[in-house]
């Protein structure tokens, strides 16, 4: 059962990490509306969710190398979920979307595959579908939110912070690296013009991310 206040289940941890990827470090607190919503869905307190997200932060090289730190007491199951996500971002992004949809509709997660049908089937970005809720859209939205949160909603080259003009750009093109298509560390938050320049090879990055 996903909804439980006992020991953390793997499904709860997946949903927590899924949310962690989409929030900047400064918003990992119990007053965050998104944390409150997840807490309500899975039967946890907002404080418990916030603490778990900060536990995940202790495993995040991007956080640790910046001089910040999490709580440092991540469990073995926390680490297992972390590794699973990094091994298959697409699969876990879809699975978490299914879990969230199931909880939000009041169904058990096991029934979601039938409720949604093929709309969230694991498929390539090349697969075309006319359904409103598609795997492609789920993946794209996850990657965009994860990348923008990593860069605190600002273009990493110009500092522009207007969301409507920001693009989550892939460092290694998605067509060339299927494994890391949804990996936030393979993304740059760029303004539309910088994204276009980067895509056309007018701007390049060195291995240490110098322009």
Model-identified regions with their sequence ranges:
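Short alpha-helical "recognition helix" segments of helix-turn-helix
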Residues: 34-39
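Major-groove recognition helix of helix-turn-helix-like DNA-binding domains
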Residues: 44-59
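Short helix->loop/beta-hairpin flanking segments within DNA-binding domains
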Residues: 20-30
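Short Lys/Arg-enriched helix C-cap and helix-to-coil transition segments
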Residues: 61-81
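Hydrophobic alpha-helical segments and helix pairs
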Residues: 82-125
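Short, Lys/Arg-enriched anionic-surface-contact patches
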Residues: 2-22, 134
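Histidine-centered nuclease catalytic patch
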Residues: 157-188, 199-211
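Short, charged surface segments at domain edges that flank catalytic/cofactor-binding sites
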Residues: 115-160, 172-185
């Amino acid at each position: 059962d996903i909804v439980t206040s006992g020991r953390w289940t793997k499904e709860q941890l997946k949903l927590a990490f899924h949310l962690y990827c989409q929030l900047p470090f400064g918003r990992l607190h119990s007053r965050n509306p998104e944390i409150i919503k997840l807490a309500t869905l899975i039967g946890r307190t907002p404080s418990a969710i916030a603490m778990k997200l900060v536990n995940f932060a202790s495993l995040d090289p991007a956080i640790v190398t910046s001089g910040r730190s999490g709580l440092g007491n991540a469990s073995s199951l926390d680490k297992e979920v972390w590794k699973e996500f990094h091994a298959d971002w697409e699969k876990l992004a879809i699975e978490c979307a299914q879990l969230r949809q199931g909880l939000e509709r009041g169904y058990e997660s096991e029934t979601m595959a039938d409720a949604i049908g093929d709309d969230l089937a694991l498929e390539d970005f090349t697969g075309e579908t006319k359904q409103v809720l598609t795997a492609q859209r789920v993946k794209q939205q996850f990657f965009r939110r994860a990348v923008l949160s990593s860069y605190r909603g600002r273009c990493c080259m110009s500092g522009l912070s207007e969301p409507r003009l920001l693009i989550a750009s892939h460092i290694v093109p998605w067509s060339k690296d299927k494994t890391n298509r949804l990996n936030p560390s393979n993304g740059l938050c760029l303004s539309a013009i910088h994204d276009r320049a980067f895509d056309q090879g007018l701007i390049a990055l060195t291995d240490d991310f110098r322009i």
